[in-house]
Amino acid sequence: MTPIRAVQDLIHLDMDAIKAYEQAIKACEHENVKSQLKSFQGDHQRHVQDLSEELRKLGEQPDARTDIKGFFIEAFTAVTAHGTKSALLAMRGNEQLTTARYKAAVDLQDVPDSTKEIIRKNYADEQRHLEWIKMALDQKIWEQEKPGGQPPQPGQP
């Protein structure tokens, strides 16, 4: 795979993630989780901007359209994300895919240093997203806060 094709693929992947996060945010019932998911969505938006700018510097036009995979990722997230727990479960799968794809891109040869640096930075974001989602699932944070963002009151479930 050429470096240009790899960067285009990462742009598509991040575009898909933006749409998947939109569905997960809609499904999420807890404000602290929703806020974190919005932050992660913002990271993916920045990835698209940074990678697109890098492609332009390399003399290429970015293709920010989503493809059929993106449609299925967004649809899967919408269908499976009903409530905070299921939104997190759906996004865990999406972030596992994104993290793996970025890891593979970090290992590509013949990539300009400036491009490699952007990919490394984005990969670090993906690792952070996945770790937070895993932590949230492990700690069942939806049980620690009432829907709408209010922490549980003493003596109340």
Feature annotation, model-predicted:
Residues 1-4, 58, 72, 78-84, ...:
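Membrane-interacting alpha-helical segments
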Residues 32-67, 129-140:
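Conserved alpha-helical segments that form or flank metal/cofactor-binding pockets of metalloenzymes
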Residues 2-10, 30-49, 84-88, 113-127:
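Alpha-helical scaffold segments that form or flank carboxylate-/histidine-based iron centers
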